[in-house]
């Protein structure tokens, strides 16, 4: 990972499943990811809170917004305030998607928290054809960023092949969300500022 990071000037986001993984990420990565299944792994959250690296905290599959924010508090209570929230879909009764991307959580979080929130339309749907429309929607409702699966040849991907975009699809997605961002950012920021004043 360190070689790739240096060769291509990339930032590395890596998921920690156990506390010792954080030691490795601190040496070779740039951001610690806490996945949905570990959102309430409190010892892992506390260890991430003692790190100097930013932490990307994915929402648990059945977590309320309050539970998600309280998980972030575990990290911040240890001194690490560099927490990024990631909406990645919740479990519902829907069978046409892998998960249900809760886009309403984005403006809700922006209203009650200072933390940045990004959207993962890849895991939020599990289907590549839905990623771009939901990425556009995520940016439109005020997401601070996106997490998108991309692979040169999705059919050969070792994981998450069904939800991965090709590089050309990703390039088109970026064009589209940048246009939406230009229009919606002033509105989203105004909403966040109004909340802070109120």
What are these regions (language model features)?
Residues 37-104:
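Conserved anion-binding
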Residues 36-40, 138-163:
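Glycine-rich phosphate-binding active-site loops on the catalytic face of alpha/beta enzymes
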Residues 12-15, 30-34, 55-59, 83-87, ...:
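Hydrophobic faces of well-ordered beta-strands that scaffold small-molecule active sites
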Residues 1-12, 47-54, 103-118, 163-187:
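Alpha-helix-loop-beta-strand connector modules within alpha/beta enzyme cores
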Residues 20-28, 65-71, 126-144, 152, ...:
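Catalytic cores of alpha/beta
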Residues 76-141:
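Active-site/ligand-binding-proximal alpha/beta "capping" segment
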Residues 1-29, 41-44:
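N-terminal active-site wall of soluble small-molecule enzyme domains
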Residues 24-33, 49-55, 76-82, 113-116, ...:
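Glycine-enriched alpha-helix->loop->beta-strand junction motifs that scaffold or abut catalytic
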């Amino acid at each position: 990972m360190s070689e790739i990071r240096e060769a291509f000037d990339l930032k590395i986001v890596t998921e920690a499943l156990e506390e010792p993984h954080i030691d490795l990420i601190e040496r070779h990565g740039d951001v610690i990811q806490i996945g949905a299944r570990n959102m309430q792994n409190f010892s892992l959250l506390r260890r991430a809170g003692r790190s100097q690296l930013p932490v990307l905290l994915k929402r648990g599959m059945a977590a309320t917004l309050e539970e998600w924010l309280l998980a972030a508090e575990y990290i911040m209570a240890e001194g690490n305030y560099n927490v990024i929230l990631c909406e990645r879909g919740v479990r519902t009764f829907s069978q046409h998607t892998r998960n249900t991307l809760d886009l309403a959580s984005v403006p809700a979080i922006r209203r009650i928290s200072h933390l940045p929130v990004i959207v993962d339309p890849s895991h939020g749907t599990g289907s590549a054809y839905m990623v771009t429309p939901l990425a556009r929607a995520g940016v439109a409702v005020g997401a601070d960023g996106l997490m998108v699966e991309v692979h040169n040849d999705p059919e050969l991907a070792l994981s998450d092949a069904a939800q991965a975009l090709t590089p050309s699809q990703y390039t088109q997605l970026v064009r589209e969300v940048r246009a939406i961002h230009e229009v919606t950012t002033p509105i989203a920021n105004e909403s966040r500022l109004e909340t802070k004043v109120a």
